[in-house]
Amino acid sequence: MAKEQTSYPVVDLFAGPGGLGEGFATALGERGEPRFESVVAIERDEFSHQTLLLRHFLRHFATDARPDDYYRYLRGEIDRNDLYRRHTAEFKKASASALKISLGPENHALVKRLIDQRIADCRRWALVGGPPCQAYSLVGRSRMMGQPGFEQDERHFLYLEYLKIIIDHQPPVFVMENVKGLLSAKIGGQPVINRIVSDLTSPKMAVGNEANGLGYKLYSLSEDERPGEEVDPRLFLVRAEDYGVPQARHRMFIVGIRNDLNVRPGRLRPHAPPTLRQTIGGLPAVRSSLSKGGDSLERWRDEIAQLASSDIARQLNGSQYTRDIVKGIELLKTQGGHGPRSSSSARYEADALAGHPALSYLRDKNLDVLTAHEARGHMPSDLRRYFYASVYADVTGRSPKLSDFPKSLLPAHQNVELGRTGKMFSDPFRVQLPDQVATPITSHLSKDGHYFIHYDPSQCRSLTVREAARLQTFPVNYS
């Protein structure tokens, strides 16, 4: 009698630092056993791969038996190479599953061989991940073939490579994740998403092979109806905040089930998300630093104190909230000595997370150090804008638009006036409101700091990497 399969192999393409794979890895059975095992995870970026490898390494230890060396590494007492040398067996296993490879024609044979080896004769496994969103800008292959350089475009290769991997290995199930923007993207006036649905339904036909044979039924995770080419593709959209995630992240998830299988996925169960305050409010308060001219607590306070309440009152010209905003600014300026003194903190208290059930798996009772909780440096002018914006949000319950700023605080950019009059983006300085979920966290946080202003005026800064990671539901020990 065949042995019952206790966990399902997962092949993770375009894995990044491992976020999607982490979700599968944390899915447990009735006895607490892992339901999925990542046997191949492929990522080409060096830094993302380092994070991916470390996480695969950690998964080879039981949750209640993680080595103290891992926590010593997080505390900076040993480096990553020391950690791996002390646990060579686990490192060897992780190195075999977390792979730094560029997907494409040059590595197609290698990737095919690796997946064949790891899947072997297993009949129940899943392919997860999806090509970077840029791949779909050239998805209309039949209409684009005449364009110079199309065949050499990497984006074209990435999308075709994804389809070829499906054809090569015929996974029973695939889960393709991608950006909401696919719903509005068009090539030659035709919706890109329609072509993608057609390609995923019949992958062989998509690459010019036979029109019959391998095929998939495509399902939504948020709706009962099975979408097809004639059904509104918006059914594939998953609004993360509807399912317990503390950010308004809207992503497309297409679940493909091979045609010969008589199964269908269930729907995600909606439940309320934790608020921003519940998710990051327990982290140590840290102040921003000054990016130019040297940083010190005294100079930082002096720069913020230059925000003149009288000027603000005059320029707001008696708006509804003027008195409360001015009062809030003056109160915080006089209490400046009681705010955070440092721009970083490694202190971690295991019970700092609020009691929301969606946050329970972020904890690690053995962790005593916090990584990546360091505020960015900002220009003095931005400090005052952040301070004003967070006070405004505290008083009004909303993030200010450009038209809500005193002119003395506005940057001297042409786009600012266009924003004030509604002709361009009107909210380049966006406060993350404490009693709501966060707006979507981007992968380039350092470039988009203005969009992620902390709600606490006394900290006067954008979100730290650790705060952003927590809002993306990475566990607190993810490094």
Describe each PLM feature range.
Residues R31-E33, L268-R269, H454-S458:
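Short aromatic-glycine motifs in intrinsically disordered, low-complexity regions
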Residues R118-A120, L138-P411:
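Class I S-adenosyl-L-methionine
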Residues K3-T6, L13, D45, G189, ...:
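Active-site-proximal structural scaffolding
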Residues A2-P9, A15, G19-H169, K180-N194, ...:
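Core alpha/beta nucleotide-donor-binding catalytic domains of modification enzymes
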Residues S7-V10, V39, R124, L235, ...:
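Extracellular structured ligand-interaction cores
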